[in-house]
Curated annotation (Swiss-Prot):
The keyword Phosphoprotein does not apply. The keyword Methyltransferase does not apply. It comes from the Bacteria. The gene is kup2. It is a multi-pass membrane protein. This is Probable potassium transport system protein Kup 2. Belongs to the HAK/KUP transporter (TC 2.A.72) family. GO terms for cellular component: plasma membrane. Keywords: Cell inner membrane, Cell membrane, Ion transport, Membrane, Potassium, Potassium transport, Symport, Transmembrane, Transmembrane helix, Transport. It comes from Mesorhizobium japonicum (strain LMG 29417 / CECT 9101 / MAFF 303099) (Mesorhizobium loti (strain MAFF 303099)). Residues 1-21 are annotated as: Disordered. InterPro entries: K+_transporter, K_trans_C, K_trans_N, Kup. The chain crosses the membrane at residues 29-49, 68-88, 116-136, 150-170, 180-200, 228-248, 258-278, 300-320, 359-379, 381-401, 409-429, 434-454.
Amino acid sequence: MDLASRDSEAETVEQSSHSGAEQHSTKVLMLGALGVVYGDIGTSPIYAFREALHASPGIDTRAQVLGVLSLIVWALTIIVTIKYVAFVLRADNKGEGGTLSLMSLARTAYPKGARLILAIGLCGAALFFGDSIITPAISVLSAVEGLRVVTPTLDPYVVPITLLILAILFSVQRFGTGKVAAVFGPVTALWFLAIGVAGLYHLLDDPSILLAINPYYAVTYLASTPTAAFVTVGAVFLAVTGAEALYVDLGHFGRKPIVLAWFSVVFPCLLLNYFGQGAFVLANGGRPTNPFFQMLPDWALMPMVGLATAATVIASQAVISGAFSLTRQAVQLNLLPRIEVQHTSEMQLGQIYMPRINLLVALGVMLLVVGFGSSSSLASAYGISVTGEMLMTTILLFVVMRKLWKWRLAVALPLTLLFGIIDSGFFLANIVKIFEGGWVSITVACLMGLIMWTWIRGTRYLFDKTRRNEIPLDFLAANLLKKKPHLVPGTAVFLTSDPLSAPTALMHSLKHYKVLHEQNVILSVVTAPQPVVSDSDRVKMETVNDLFMRVTLTFGYMEQPNIPRALAICRKRGWKFDIMTTSFFLSRRSLKASPNSGMPVWQDRLFIGLARTAADATEYFQIPTGRVVEIGTQVAI
């Protein structure tokens, strides 16, 4: 009896310890999520309420203030709380989120609609790239503009200071964000606490502002002045920009910490600040130029400008990291050519740096800051890409609801229509700003969409053309077994995208050197529709005959391919792989445009240009350079 009670006590202590560790882990992840996930939406109060008020005509009346605030409250509730927190976050692809993850999930669930789903996914990804150059520009610029409230004499220095901060931000990317990321959470937590307290303090200026919780004021405002309200709706959307980050960063933190952080910290503090700004405007009358900073006491202005700048830099960092992550996914899914990837952490594989993407985003951001000069001007450019991306998410979510979750149409359709109508309304309200700055995000999105479409189309035509000219591997292997050429010791690995055909490098080797290795491996690398592939599913081996073997390596779209490490798994399957006796044969294609390619000449040239910029296969697949033999071939597409 005594032993049983001791065992019971020990079990209770163990369970308590496990529960405590789990709770601690959740709190740590919550803190991290505050910095990475909620940085963008958390800095929206700096400019969202101001822009929404300024979009409405004339002097701000009580009805206008309550109407605008009610629209913001219900936009946060329906789009973020209901759509993303309650539904979209459930659509994880093996724990990962984001447009391309959702696209892969939808394509797997509904193969018949694969092409249409791919097109929707491409649009969503292209729009994200448009967002990635606007977010750092408007966020940091809006924070530094707080200096104008401190003293108007600092106005000429706003743009130079913004450019300096952004230049430092992009220049330190190559060192990785691991060490700095440790302070992201605490700084952002302090930011939310500060904006919440500031809002709560001014809430007492006019407590009747809480009436804005009633959607009646939003509906009345929309109905009373439809034309002006339509423009205001486009500005109201600024309050929910960053909602997509909840889904994009799902794989970094998990659903539970993201949801808990939203309900316990982010949502309450955002509401308090927006209500505080509304009460401040009602109590003071007129039309404030910057209510977020103007409602602060003089002693708090400079500290808040500093904290706002830190918070917006963190928000920008999250978007830059997201651009790196999305680009890697696109490369793995063969939507873009290979791009150089540098790992900045030995512990966290997700922490990567892409020099070319970093440079392009930096140039885009700097040009926007110089060209537009103020966050108010940039606000017009901001909404289109984000609203478009959210609309793509809604469409893909419907496919997942119906085909993967097997929801009835009577349940899935009303929800999709609700989200779709709201997303479409915001999109249309922003599309009218296309000549005021919206053309920027549309141009970037169209350019990225064109690049991805050209790469997909070009690689498909190239694959079909080369396959028609290649000999079936089984036929060649059988003939070489009957009439063997001179055999040399060692193993030859031939990389190819088509494991059924004899690789070009193999044919050129036989033609010019008249020799064959004792063991020849036809190696192909494929990307799975899930983010990560376990080692047990990594390698597929197939013996063709005594001379040839097919090996297929599978990587998830979030993984960086490492061929030598993956081939080491083959030792457990019977193939004694030794890197020191293995030569890797790669075919380097020199492409030439052809009138019979199936694509217009301009697209041929664009595809050839993209192919030339592709990162070296040796480095990309992490093959030791001393073990590589490259054979050049010329191909007309």
